[in-house]
Amino acid sequence: MAESNADVYASFGVNNAVMTGSTPTEHEQNMLSLDVAARDGDDAIVLSDEPTSHNDDPYAAGVDPFADGEDDEGRIQVRISEDGNEAGFDTDGDNSEVETEGEDVEFEPLGDTPEELSQVTEQLGQHEEGFQAMVEQAVERGLSADSVSRIYEEYEADGISEKSYAELEAAGYSRAFVDSYISGQEALVDQYVNQVVAFAGGQERFSAIHTHLEATNPAAAESLESAMMNRDLATVKAIINLAGESYTKKFGKPANRSVTKRATPVKPVARQKEGFTNQAEMIKAMSDPRYRSDSAYRQMVEQKVIDSSF
């Protein structure tokens, strides 16, 4: 029995379901006459109008095409604009505050005393000597020793009393003259304190160091205050340097520690205090070249300054 055309096509995997004619030529003509989308076995191709504008931003629709739709674990999606700058960010999940560590604090040892500080210190001393000379001259004019003691106490405290004003005026010093003199002295004191604070690194740094001393070494804090009142700049600098180093160790850069070593607490040992016997010995130690170049020597000297009792 001769094979039909259908049998021939069937041997190549073609059945009657896809044949629209009795011959291949007739089938091709019938298929070409159909609408493109209706051709059997073809994929439908749909053409759309050209968009009026083109946007390369895959996030323009407000949806992250790369995000996992089921991810709800508080991830952050950041959008970058075409010019490379961050355009905005969206956060999912609960808002949480992120704590960051502050910048490392490292104290730089104080160097040479600024010329401005030295000058105002000298002016302050001269001004006080002038006040003492004025009081001594008032004594020669009849001011009593008790009045002199009282005036000094008032001068160092809250100001001259009315009684002292009257006694000074009787000795030849008017109220306006006394007030002017005291105002000048107070201005110099303010200038002196501001210069010391600036020398220490500014108000914030000075306050931090002073507070640190009050908490860890109250005696050193009192020594610093006393040295400032006495205009002892060498002692002021030594105490601030020592306190600054201690402050850095406590609040500054963390010490590098090998991960292979276990931190073992060391049993504290009481330190034996050894101060300078007099100011001349202290100045000699600070004049040593090692004070500027050897940190261990400088720390030893500064510690002896704090331990000194003179």
Swiss-Prot record:
Pfam family, one: Phage_T7_Capsid
GO biological process terms on file: viral capsid assembly
Positions of the UniProt region annotated as Disordered: 46-102
Tree of life domain: Viruses
Keywords annotated in UniProt: Viral capsid assembly, Viral release from host cell
Keyword DNA-binding: no
Biased composition (Acidic residues): 83-102
InterPro entries, alphabetized: Gp9-like
Summary of the function given for this chain in its UniProt record: Scaffolding protein involved in the icosahedric procapsid assembly. Coassembles with the capsid proteins to form the procapsid, in which the scaffolding protein is found within the external shell of icosahedrally arranged capsid protein subunits. In a subsequent step the scaffolding protein molecules are released from the procapsid. Facilitates assembly by binding to gp10 hexamers but not the pentamers and locking them into a morphogenically correct conformation.
Family: Belongs to the T7likevirus capsid assembly scaffolding protein family.
Protein name according to UniProt: Capsid assembly scaffolding protein
Source organism of this protein record: Enterobacteria phage T3 (Bacteriophage T3)
